[in-house]
């Protein structure tokens, strides 16, 4: 492949503080192949600050060895303390700029090591777990963001996540994160139950309006070569599902779109939103054998 004469930006790391924005461009130069997003070249980081997001990006671009090219930029990384407001500001800015990466996957980063030393592991971690991360264009709604831990020796995906809504940023536990992934059909997913690990490779999630509440049915299938899921574990999954749905609802996220299900059944009338009290939800879990 030809060697590009551009600095190929692979990811943006964006942090907002009291004095404005700090932007780090994770880029490849000059060995990056012009036609491949998996080009082999050292990943470097170029960091700059600015009173505005635009100014911070411009300053960082000026410090690159060659003109910035965002064609292969697929990841947007935010500080772990980021809010939905920050994501929306970034989304609005990128709509009108050459960066224009609204389809980029969004992650939060918990940083305890200098970015310059860990730029390559950070990008690799984002690439490895991209399928479980939302796109930036989804920021207009509530979203659950995966968290990457950037440490001295490595970058690794946390088993916990954060829920970003207009109400704020809410941490989700390991168990709640796994259940949220299951309900969003991001599979396979594993749970630690009854001192054993179960891994579901498939799960059908169905939701029906039932009286004044809802019935949620999870029909799953375990990964081949793993122990059968017991009745006790099914009941634990039911309780965890109920807990996760309620926690998300109370913090502004209707994870299973219960409001839309209600609207389809009753037609006109008062809409059910997360501003209402959490409705009654009956959860059932069943496992299919091979």
Can you name each region flagged by the protein language model?
Residues 1-290:
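Membrane-proximal alpha-helical signals and transmembrane carboxylates
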């Amino acid at each position: 492949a030809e060697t590009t004469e551009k600095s190929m930006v692979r990811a943006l790391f964006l942090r907002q503080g009291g004095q404005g924005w700090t932007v780090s461009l994770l880029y490849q130069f000059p060995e990056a192949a012009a036609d491949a997003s998996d080009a082999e070249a050292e990943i470097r980081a170029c960091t700059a600050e600015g009173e505005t997001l635009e100014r911070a990006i411009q300053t960082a671009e000026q410090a690159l060895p060659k003109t910035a090219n965002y064609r292969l930029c697929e990841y947007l990384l935010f500080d772990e303390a980021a809010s939905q407001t920050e994501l929306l500001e970034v989304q609005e800015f990128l709509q009108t700029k050459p960066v224009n990466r609204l389809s980029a996957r969004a992650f939060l980063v918990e940083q305890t090591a200098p970015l310059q030393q860990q730029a390559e592991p950070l990008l690799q971690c984002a690439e490895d777990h991209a399928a479980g991360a939302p796109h930036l264009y989804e920021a207009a709604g509530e979203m659950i963001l995966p968290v990457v831990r950037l440490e001295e020796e490595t970058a690794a995906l946390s088993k916990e996540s954060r829920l970003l809504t207009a109400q704020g940023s809410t941490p989700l536990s390991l168990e709640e994160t796994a259940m949220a992934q299951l309900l969003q059909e991001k599979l396979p997913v594993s749970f630690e139950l009854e001192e054993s690990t179960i891994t579901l490779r498939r799960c059908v999630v169905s939701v029906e309006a039932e009286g004044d509440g809802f019935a949620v049915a999870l029909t799953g299938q375990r990964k081949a070569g793993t122990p059968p899921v017991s009745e006790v574990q099914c009941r634990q999954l039911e309780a965890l599902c109920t807990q996760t749905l309620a926690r998300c609802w109370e913090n502004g996220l209707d994870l299973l779109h219960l409001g839309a299900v209600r609207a389809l059944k009753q037609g006109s009338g008062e809409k059910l939103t997360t501003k209402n009290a959490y409705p009654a939800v009956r959860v059932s879990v069943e496992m299919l054998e091979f």
